[in-house]
Every structure is written in structure tokens, then in C-alpha cells.
């Protein structure tokens, strides 16, 4: 069974179609890149999968279920916005996640913090942007979820932090789960992807294995993306 399936899915805001008749399936055990320019529909699709938006037409299924309380138990979501309360420490955030999510693996989170040299007692308000993004990612990847939805996980951080974030994603996701990474920084994430989806103006242009693109097109995913989306 696909971990995520869209069937003729559309989402409109007024007269604007953010997603237009999207059909796709994502299988477990894959790291998938959701790639497209700004405003292409990436965040809308992720919010629909997380139950933050409802479809205008069609349907979206997570592990065979419509998004709701049951699917939230198997989906771990990283927003493209910072959401950590300033007054909380990393330890308090782990306490909250441990109370709220049955699948939160505190030992895994503590190991990642130790590896980075991050202080559990540090308050969010004293953290740099890069540190806050690392803490958010650690919390999300420390859940033993079936589907990880990561919206721009490497946006706005330095190259060394990007490398750490990608390494953290690969090291810590359940191989029976799927990871959907939304980004426009293709060259940075290409190394970790099994599959890519190209999206533009709310429509799916392509869904393909990364190896197939390299073999059939004779170019990297980043090069092919630039070719497809060139002005």
C-alpha cells in the first residue's frame, strides 16, 4: 500500500488553483524530492498531507486513510516556518514531544543533540537560526513515523549545516518509512534522493527515479531541473 496517495487532487484559494488534478503515489522506503520553483504548490501539497488544509476536489490518503487524528500519529511534519516557543529549552521541548507523541524516541533525540554539542538547557530565544532549525529537525526525525514531511529543511542555513541536516535525515529515518523533502535547492539534496517529483503551477510535470533521469537524460537531477524549468 502506498504511504501517500493523491487521486485527482485539487486545491483552490478563491479562483487560484494551488494544486490542479494531482495524482501520485509514494511508496515506503524512499526519500523523495518534491521539487519546483516558489509558488509551484509544494507547501500546499504538504499541508494537505498533514491535514492542515482540506481538498477542494479529489482525495489524499495517508496509509490508506484520509488525513485526520489517525494519520497524525504516523506523520512527522517539519514546517518551513519556525514554531518553537522562545521560552522553552531543548529539554522542555523533548518533554513536550515525549508527552504528545507515543512514537517519540527520546534516546535518539539526545544522541543527536550530543553529536552536535547542543545544550539541552539552552532556551530557544538564545539560539541562532541554524541551531533552532537543527533542534526542530531533531525533534521531527526522532519520531518513529511512517511518513516524514519536510518543508524546506535546508533553507536559510549555511552549507555545513545543510550537510548535517541531510546526514541526520538519512541516518535517522525508519527504512520502512518514506521521506518527502520539499526544496528548491536541488544540488544540495540530490545525493540523498531516490525519487523526484517536479511540480509547476500546481501540476505534476514528472515523477521519476533519480537513477533513471541520470541514465536516460545523461545529466544530474539539478541539471535536468534547470532544463525543464528554464525561462
Stretches with model-predicted labels:
Residues 35-37:
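The feature captures the beta-strand-to-loop junction immediately N-terminal to the Walker
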Residues 50:
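Helix-to-loop junction immediately C-terminal to a conserved catalytic motif
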Residues 57-71:
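Conserved ABC transporter NBD signature motif
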Residues 80-135:
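ABC-family P-loop ATPase nucleotide-binding domains
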Residues 148-152, 157:
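Catalytic Walker B motif of ABC-type/P-loop ATPase nucleotide-binding domains
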Residues 162-175:
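Helical segment within the ABC ATPase nucleotide-binding domain
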